[in-house]
Structures are given as C-alpha cells and as structure tokens.
Amino acid sequence: MMDGRSILMGRYEVGKQLGQGTFAKVYYARNLTTGQAVAIKMINKDKVMKVGLMEQIKREISIMRLVKHPNVLQLFEVMASKSKIYFVLEYAKGGELFNKIAKEGKLSEDSARRYFHQLINAVDYCHSRGVYHRDLKPENLLLDENENLKVSDFGLSALAESKRQDGLLHTTCGTPAYVAPEVLSRKGYDGAKADVWSCGVILFVLVAGYLPFHDPNLIEMYRKICRADFRCPRYFSAELKDLIHKILDSDPSTRISIPRIKRSTWYRKPVEINAKNSEAATTNSISSGVATTSGSAECSTSEENQGSLSLPNLNAFDIISLSTGFNLSGFFEDTHGHQEERFTTRQPVTTVLGKLKELAKRLKLKVKKKDNGVLRLAAPKEGKKGFLELDAEIFEVTPSFLLVELKKTNGDTMEYRKLVKEDIRPALKDIVWVWQGDEHLNSQSILQGEQQQSPLPPELPQDQLQPSLPQQEKQDMPEPPLLPQVPQEEVQTSIPAEQTKN
C-alpha cells in the first residue's frame, strides 16, 4: 500500500470493481509507470483448480497472446501470486455492446454495418490464426472510448489443434441463443462456420433490437435454431435480409463464408466514419494483422548493431516461474517430458555468451550463433536419437537481470539431462544466480526489487460502483431474452432460406 491506495505488484494502482463472476473479479486500475488505464481480472486459483478449469485458463492465455488485432481486447500481461492469477487487460471504457443496445435501442443499418465490419475483421483474423471463439454475443463485444469494437472473453475458444481426425470440433459450448444448429446436434462441427452463424445472430440483434431465436421453452428455442425458424422485421432492407438469411442457414455446408460476406451488397455499402477515430486507421492496422503493445509476450527479432546485442524482453508472466512460490509451470504448461532448463543471472550478456562459448569449447560442442541472443550448441557425435542439439536463449528481464533458457531441440532426452546435470550446471555455477526449480532457494527473494506484492484491494460496497463502468464479467445465469420481442405487426413472413441461397 502507498498513500492509502491499493497497489498491486508495485505496478498498478487498483480502483473500483467493474464486475464479478464465479471465479474472478474485474477491477479498474492504472499503470503507475505510464498512467494507462487497464482492467485487471483477478482469478481465484484455488476455485479454478477445484472445478478443473486449469486447461481453460491456460487456453485463454495462449489464445489472447496469439491474437493481436485492433478489434480484439488486448492482454497486456499476466501476473500471479500463490492464490491469484491476474490478467492485465485493455480497458474498454465504452462498456458492452449489449448495454448500448439495451439503453439506446436498435441501431440503424449504417451504424450496425460499422460494428459488423469490425466484428467480421476480428473473427476473420482469429480464424486465420487457427482460433475459433465459440461464444460470440453482444455481451462479449466491448467498446473502447472511441466506440471501436473489441472482441473479448476467449475462455471457451478452441485452437485448430483441438480438432479430431475428422477435422471437426466436438465440444458443445457457447450461449444457447447464439449457438449454431450443428453445435447443438453434438456432432462434429466447423468452428469457423459456427462463429459465422453467431455473427449473423449478432447482426440481427444490432438492427432489430431483439433475438431472432427465442422461446421461454429452451427445447422449442433449440428447434427454432435447428430449423432456422426466424422472421425479419419489415424495416430491414432487402440487402440485409438477403445477407442474414445466407448467414443463418441451418446447413453449414451451404452457409455463406466470410469472404462471401465481404463481397455481399449490404456489407460493401459505405461505412460510417467515427469522428474520434477514422475507419482508415483501423483498416490500416487490420491489414498488418498485428497490434503492438508494451506488454506483448511475443519477442521481436533483432540483430546485432555496432557490437551491441538486442535481447527479447520478458513480462511478468514469463518470470513467474523463477521461484517456487510463484511457479505456475505445472498449472499452465505440460511438464511431461520436460526438456528445458532455465536460470537467472545478474551478469552482463557478454559474460553469459562468453561462458557459454567457453563451455562449448571444453565439451567440443559445435556453436552456431543465431539472432536475438540465441546460441545453437550441437554434439559432435551422433547419440541414440541422432545428434544432440540445444538452444541457449537469453532474455532481458531488466537491464541488470537476465533469464537464460537451455532447450533441447534434437536428440535423446536422457543424454540431454545427463549433459545438463554433469557438465552444464557445474560449468556455469559462477554466473548463475538461481536455477529454476531449486527448492532450497527463497522464492520471494528472486523477485525482490522487481515486483513487490501488496494486499489485494478491499471489497467495495455495491453502492460505490460507477454504473457507467463496463461489467466485463458477470455471473453465469440462464440466457434471458435480449430485449422484448417486437410486436407481431412489425414482422413480415420470413423468406425460406432455400430461396436466398446462391
């Protein structure tokens, strides 16, 4: 604590609670160094572990690090203590798109088109990275201060590698009113096509102000979804009706794809330009496919310049595993067949490189210098499983604090472990401060001077919460109708999907 304020890890001043869920609370916070407003999601580690959601947390971290896009909520960094996991997220000042619709009512087609463009661009980018959201809905679409859309909540997302041999996903998840028919069937489904369906439901909601599929009886609602039984309001333009019927096609094999959506007449109409932040700037960022952030865990490639070596930086999540007390490697990573060794050092990078080269010379290992502080060390003789090779990569935690990772890239694991134990560890003892996993070390001292954990912010009375702040996480509850159903006199008979297919 400093001056009566709640300070987390010596880096963030924590303010009012924004929302609360079963396993986490979300707080507004400010970066003490940059002054940047952020949202911090505090996850109760014990609760998550008890209900077996470790893999879901791990997946959410992996996916949010993988996806860097202007219309995807940015994960700046992840921190942890013994009892909590902290997601430091981009603060979406505009709140949920759901709340905007509930407060202001249905949008004009021009306004809806702008949000739909951003949604489709974000989803298309996620799919290009092998990520399928699987829970797209207005509650998971946030708005920044310029009312640009941000896709959030990747807790139910799937990676392409999650597919079975048939190339399909098999886990039923998502919110019932937005879920595609093939997902409800509990058979294999294409994650990309299921996301497209959800985008269609969202588009309908934006312009109509209510859900296309809703019934007090959940089974009846499922039947409506599986039959694509819905009606468009009379005020929908012909082009919008045509597009929605092609998206909300119960047959995934004939459902319109994202490239075809982008070529549709309605989609290609001019988009409203936000006066605060022009669409052109967003488009330029989208075309690059990358949003650069200070907390990104991805390392940029650098080359030596005038004799100096540029090293990749590590954020707080990357150095959590430096001590036993903060070690989450078993929680976030598959430790079976562990093939990495890590140590920290306060020696300069030139000393570390010199020591590694000296070690290689003594062991008669071939040395190949790579970019970004990486040395490839290779055994001169072939072993049980080919030539043993390992990479030594150096990361900069702070200018005076380095992390060195030794990782086997080829050869027999037992030979690698023997080499580390009998040769590498003894040879590097003069420069090593601590090897990861050494139990005799004081876990808290490793991060001394880098991070100081302060008490968590106290519980805030509900009457102190600002109603204008977005609720970024809510209790799980049965899906209610988004808004009251439109009067029947405003509804016209739907056009059969078969008549709208190309």
Curated annotation (Swiss-Prot):
Reactions catalysed: L-seryl-[protein] + ATP = O-phospho-L-seryl-[protein] + ADP + H(+); L-threonyl-[protein] + ATP = O-phospho-L-threonyl-[protein] + ADP + H(+)
Region (PPI): 339-367
A Pfam family per the record: NAF
InterPro entries: Kinase-like_dom_sf, NAF/FISL_domain, NAF_dom, Prot_kinase_dom, Protein_kinase_ATP_BS, Ser/Thr_kinase_AS
UniProt keyword terms in alphabetical order: ATP-binding, Kinase, Manganese, Nucleotide-binding, Serine/threonine-protein kinase, Transferase
Active site (catalytic residues): 135
Region (Activation loop): 153-182
Residue ranges annotated for the Protein kinase domain, each copy included: 12-267
Induction: By drought and salt stresses and abscisic acid (ABA).
Cofactor(s) the protein requires to work: Mn(2+)
Composition skew (Polar residues), residue ranges: 493-502
Residues spanning the signal sequence: none
Residue ranges of domain NAF in the record: 297-333
Record PROSITE patterns: NAF (PS50816), PROTEIN_KINASE_ATP (PS00107), PROTEIN_KINASE_DOM (PS50011), PROTEIN_KINASE_ST (PS00108)
Disordered: annotated segments: 447-502
Biased composition regions of type Low complexity, renumbered to the chain: 461-472
UniProt EC number: 2.7.11.1
Stretches assigned to coiled coil: none
Residues noted as binding ATP in the record, renumbered to the chain: 18-26, 41
Family: Belongs to the protein kinase superfamily. CAMK Ser/Thr protein kinase family. SNF1 subfamily.
Role this protein plays: CIPK serine-threonine protein kinases interact with CBL proteins. Binding of a CBL protein to the regulatory NAF domain of CIPK protein lead to the activation of the kinase in a calcium-dependent manner.
Record's comment describing the protein's domains: The activation loop within the kinase domain is the target of phosphorylation/activation by upstream protein kinases. The PPI motif mediates the interaction with the ABI (abscisic acid-insensitive) phosphatases.
Listed name of the protein: CBL-interacting protein kinase 11
